[in-house]
């Protein structure tokens, strides 16, 4: 299974709630840059999951403009403070497909630590508009291999 972890770009600080915060103009430019780099990697992506937060949905739209065959499903399992073990279960349920997750920190950083190192305590960090490609033969903590990181 291939898993692409995508953190949204830099978000605007002005909004009524955290969920409503959209991308700043710099975040939009970052997303466009990293999606172009992802396209050059010819990824095999069959399904997408996106956080219901506005900035993640905007990032998923940027991905869809380049990869129109990817259908995204909105899920609260990947909101910023979600439990990475719940995300691991989501991946296990979809292990017959290569997926992209468009989400936030800290859940993405915790997830990459869990998949690659077997613990969320390893303190890996994912920057804005970064894309990580992970490969897993078995969907379980500690079995993920980080193949590459794309930055804007």
PLM regions with names:
Residues 2-78, 82, 108-109, 122, ...:
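Active-site-proximal alpha-helix that buttresses catalytic centers in soluble enzyme cores
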Residues 3, 96-103:
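Generic beta-sheet signal
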Residues 41-44, 93-97:
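Glycine-rich phosphate-binding loop signature in dinucleotide/nucleotide-binding domains
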Residues 73, 113-118:
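Short Pro/Gly-enriched beta-strand edge/turn motifs at strand-loop
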Residues 79-91:
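Short alpha-helix plus adjacent loop in nuclease-associated cores
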Residues 105-115:
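Extended, charge-rich low-complexity interaction segments
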Residues 119-145:
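Domain-level recognition of soluble alpha/beta enzyme cores
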Residues 147-152:
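Short, solvent-exposed aromatic-acidic interface loops
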């Amino acid at each position: 299974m291939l898993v692409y972890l995508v953190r949204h770009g830099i978000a605007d600080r002005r909004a009524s709630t955290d969920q409503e915060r959209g991308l700043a103009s710099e975040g939009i430019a970052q997303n466009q840059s990293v999606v172009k780099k992802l396209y050059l990697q010819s990824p095999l992506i069959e399904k997408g999951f996106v956080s219901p937060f506005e900035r993640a949905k905007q990032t998923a739209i940027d991905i869809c403009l380049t990869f129109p065959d990817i259908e995204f499903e909105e899920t609260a399992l990947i909101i910023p403070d979600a439990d990475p073990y719940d995300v691991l279960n989501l991946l296990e349920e979809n292990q017959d497909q290569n997926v992209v997750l468009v989400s936030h920190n800290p859940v993405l950083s915790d997830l990459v630590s869990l998949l690659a190192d077997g613990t969320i305590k390893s303190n890996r960090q994912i920057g804005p508009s970064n894309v990580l490609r992970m490969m897993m033969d078995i969907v379980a903590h500690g079995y993920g291999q980080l193949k590459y990181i794309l930055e804007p």
